[in-house]
A protein has these predicted regions:
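Catalytic alpha-helical scaffold of carbohydrate-active enzymes acting on polysaccharides/glycoconjugates
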Residues: 1-119, 124-154
C-alpha cells in the first residue's frame, strides 16, 4: 500500500474568526486535539493569531513543546492581503501596514515559544504581493495561504 503524505495545519483564533470574542475552541478543543495528535503521532502546524496567543501563552508553549510547529496567522485576524470579496465590517490593511503588523505578530509568537517562527497563513486565505514581500523580508520559509492545487501539484 502506498503511503499518503498529508500536511495538517490548524488556525487558532476566536471561535468565529473576527466576529466573536469567545475562545471555547482554544480552551476546550485544543487539549482534545493534542491528545488525538499524540495518540496518532500526527505532527501539525498551528497558525496562531498573535492576540490569541498572547491570551493563552501556556497553550502555545504546550503545543510547541509537544513537537508541533508554531506558525503565524496575523496580529488580530485582520485582512492582511488582497480581499478576494467584500466582507461587511472588515477592511484590508493598507500596504504600508502589512510588514509592521506581521513583524509584531511574529515577535509576540517568538517571545512565547523562544525561537523563530517561519510559517504563515493569511486570514481568510487572502494573500497578495505585499504579504509575500513582507514574509520574505522577515525570513519566513512557508506561506500556507494557498492550497496545493493552486500550484497544480497534488
Amino acid at each position: 500500500m502506498r503511503e499518503i503524505q498529508v500536511v495538517f495545519g490548524i488556525d487558532v483564533e476566536t471561535d468565529i474568526g473576527s466576529w466573536t470574542p469567545f475562545y471555547e475552541g482554544v480552551t476546550k478543543a485544543t487539549p482534545i486535539l493534542l491528545d488525538l495528535f499524540a495518540k496518532k503521532s500526527i505532527p501539525v502546524t498551528s497558525f496562531w493569531v498573535a492576540d490569541t496567543a498572547r491570551r493563552f501563552p501556556e497553550i502555545v508553549r504546550e503545543m510547541d513543546s509537544a513537537g508541533h510547529e508554531t506558525g503565524t496567522h496575523s496580529l488580530y485576524h485582520e485582512t492582511v492581503g488582497d480581499s478576494l470579496f467584500e466582507i461587511p465590517g472588515t477592511f484590508p490593511l493598507l500596504p504600508e501596514e502589512v510588514l509592521p503588523r506581521i513583524k509584531t505578530a511574529s515577535n509576540i509568537l517568538e517571545d512565547i515559544v523562544g525561537h523563530k517562527v517561519v510559517s504563515w497563513r493569511c486570514p481568510r486565505l487572502f494573500g497578495g504581493t505585499h504579504v509575500t514581500n513582507a514574509l520574505e523580508a522577515l525570513g519566513y520559509e512557508c506561506d500556507a495561504t494557498y492550497p496545493m492545487y493552486f500550484y497544480n501539484e497534488q
